[in-house]
């Protein structure tokens, strides 16, 4: 499982264009030490299967970002990774969004090109979900109600804004507002400092590069 996750980290580094030694060290460390990843190893008899799902998710992102027609194998990888664990689609989306953010930070980047990349990633994700839903219902038409599995593919558009805001709220609560009891005070302080420092550095970068003036006109 660790070997597969290490390979997944290589896909992430390549997809995001990170070439420094620091990135090569920190990205695998973050992937292996993230809380959900650590909990994965509490079920050692399934760890290798979940690691395959993570590898497929990261490989899908790599195909999508690296090649013009990479969305084709990318869709295949995302469908297969959802077949192992649906939540790994969120991992792929997170890496894709991070890639778009890094693209915007490049001095030679054009907002129109980044926007097209974002649309491409969104469409690929939607197609992957549709293909996975169709295949899963063909193979197992009587889906059970575990965690709302029988409602998969059904989305109330009216509730969508609230669901998106709730997702951000949960992330903020996990790291800052309402951390779990197993998170020590020191870890909580480090989380808060890291979030504030990241926000400050991003704002300072945009101000220094004056993106607020010309990012939409380049």
Regions found by a protein language model. Name each.
Residues 91-126:
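Perimembrane helix-loop-helix junctions
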């Amino acid at each position: 499982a660790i070997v597969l996750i290490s390979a997944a980290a290589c896909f992430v580094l390549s997809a995001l264009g990170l070439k420094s030694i620091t990135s090569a060290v920190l990205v695998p460390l973050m992937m292996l030490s993230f809380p959900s990843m650590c909990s994965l190893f509490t079920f050692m008899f399934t760890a290798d299967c979940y690691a395959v799902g993570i590898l497929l998710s990261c490989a899908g992102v790599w195909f999508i970002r690296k090649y013009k027609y990479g969305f084709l194998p990318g869709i295949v990888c995302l469908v297969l990774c959802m077949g192992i664990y649906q939540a790994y689609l969120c991992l792929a989306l997170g890496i894709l969004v991070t890639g778009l953010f890094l693209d915007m930070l490049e001095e030679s980047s054009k907002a129109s090109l980044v926007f097209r990349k974002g649309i491409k990633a969104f469409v690929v994700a939607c197609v992957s979900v549709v293909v996975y839903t169709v295949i899963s219902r063909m193979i197992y038409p009587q889906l059970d109600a575990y965690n709302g599995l029988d409602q998969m593919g059904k989305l109330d558009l009216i509730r969508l804004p609230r669901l998106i805001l709730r997702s951000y709220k949960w992330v903020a609560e996990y790291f800052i507002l309402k951390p779990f009891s197993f998170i020590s005070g020191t870890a909580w302080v480090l989380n808060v400092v890291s979030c504030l420092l990241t926000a400050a550095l991003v704002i300072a970068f945009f101000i220094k590069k004056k993106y607020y003036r010309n990012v939409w006109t380049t």
